[in-house]
């Protein structure tokens, strides 16, 4: 039936969101060049407008807009999609800083996975 098809589509979409998000997080934290570039953009965004734009595109408004578009397609509600994207991406953005200061990096990856599982489970319920 149609509800089952929609539920399966959402589950597939959630799995892809989780995979994509984890790959991006690992890219910006564990790959040496990307991690150093992220840290440089974080510092230089306040001195160089070009770096500020790159920072926004790669780490702030760019990922938020991408998630908003995904959630808009899934939810069919642009206003709800914006808030959902903020709720989803905000903690992930914070985890970049936590990761940088953590001795146990694997614990931060676990926090990322738990956040995504909890968030997407809550989203499926509502």
Question: Model-found features: residue ranges?
Answer:
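Hydrophobic alpha-helical connector segments
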Residues: 2-34, 81-88
